[in-house]
Amino acid sequence: METQWTRMTANEAAEIIQHNDMVAFSGFTPAGSPKALPTAIARRANEQHEAKKPYQIRLLTGASISAAADDVLSDADAVSWRAPYQTSSGLRKKINQGAVSFVDLHLSEVAQMVNYGFFGDIDVAVIEASALAPDGRVWLTSGIGNAPTWLLRAKKVIIELNHYHDPRVAELADIVIPGAPPRRNSVSIFHAMDRVGTRYVQIDPKKIVAVVETNLPDAGNMLDKQNPMCQQIADNVVTFLLQEMAHGRIPPEFLPLQSGVGNINNAVMARLGENPVIPPFMMYSEVLQESVVHLLETGKISGASASSLTISADSLRKIYDNMDYFASRIVLRPQEISNNPEIIRRLGVIALNVGLEFDIYGHANSTHVAGVDLMNGIGGSGDFERNAYLSIFMAPSIAKEGKISTVVPMCSHVDHSEHSVKVIITEQGIADLRGLSPLQRARTIIDNCAHPMYRDYLHRYLENAPGGHIHHDLSHVFDLHRNLIATGSMLG
């Protein structure tokens, strides 16, 4: 079906990409991201640098790509600018050293910002596909992300045609791109599993300048679901949701869940699946990770909408081998739809995300260690946290064997404000912040979520801090952080 396209090796295709090009990669997490071109671009960068020639690209993605891909590009000094999210230790180091400019963005907003030209033109899009048609139809793979927008906006398109993916993966896709304001219609999704688009992206076939054939799996996440800390946090989340059901604040049929990525979220989903009182439920999320596949198999999750399948190769193969079952139970959408505030609010999504630190008034820091060093980025947590029916943030109460408290007097960086964070949960307990004044919130967070070794300090801070509606001692508000920098421990 795609025989008219020019076949190239990855190294040949990388020659198309020039110094300072804006390059856009498909995918959302490692799912659906290019597998061959990142290494080829890094090789080209190394060759150019050895010849004393400049060569760096500006790189747009959906969310993260595989850490290995970002690492190889970072090691080759091949990236000068990056947005909107990353999980690579090598790239993170370059960002925090100031060697790479990084723009941290709400994931739902990236496509619109590109459409309005805020970042300039996309010179080359590198898109993983499962199939092509001569008329320019492109079928995507296990992660949709911003690929539809990249395909439409890019001047040139390089396709990685990945034969690893079952062609039926296209049955999971639901591709729709909202119009531009002020003539943007509502997105007619009234149920988590509603389909409103097509299974492919239609583009001008003349833009496809190369096809690189691959047969490579996604780099799946390895998660430790047996972590006792994660299990206790998960138990507390389930306890809270059961209480909400008992009080009639969650209906008997439950509400759609959004769950972020990582060990805590994976443990929460597993615990929800094990609890007999929690009814079968839907997901309206940005990623589907490992535990979701099992819950779809058992029927505990009756349907799941997301932008990607961030799962192991074994679980992805299980889905491909049982598409007659899974095709009606999974929908993959562009991230401006999976993370769309309008839909999140309409469906009454319960958002479950992890933070780095919280302050005693309920602000949350998801991105910057000690307020300065980027970890990964805000990702989609803000899209859901600001618009969900219930915004729940989770974290261990301490890190590094107690040297760091997750609960502090004032966050060193704020991604999510007190006006949106509804519930904070650690392994210590649950802080329901709804309807509480600032001082009530502070005492609730300290008593229920802070680790016992830090509670006395936090209570003393609150009692001694001057103020009116909110109490803060600006002379000592960051003493814990200063101690950490000076001694390696917040308590000094």
UniProtKB/Swiss-Prot annotation:
Q: Name one GO molecular function term.
A: acetate CoA-transferase activity
Gene3D superfamilies for the chain: Acetyl-CoA hydrolase/transferase C-terminal domain, Glutaconate Coenzyme A-transferase
Q: Which reaction does it catalyse?
A: propanoyl-CoA + succinate = propanoate + succinyl-CoA
- Gene Ontology terms describing biological process: acetate metabolic process; acetyl-CoA metabolic process
Name the Pfam families for this protein.
Answer: AcetylCoA_hyd_C, AcetylCoA_hydro
Q: Where is the active site?
A: E286
UniProt entry keywords in alphabetical sequence: Transferase
What does the sequence similarity comment in the record state about its family?
Belongs to the acetyl-CoA hydrolase/transferase family.
Tell me, in a sentence or two, what this protein's role is. Catalyzes the transfer of coenzyme A from propionyl-CoA to succinate. Could be part of a pathway that converts succinate to propionate.
> What name does this protein carry?
Propanoyl-CoA:succinate CoA transferase
Q: Which organism is it from?
A: Escherichia coli (strain K12)
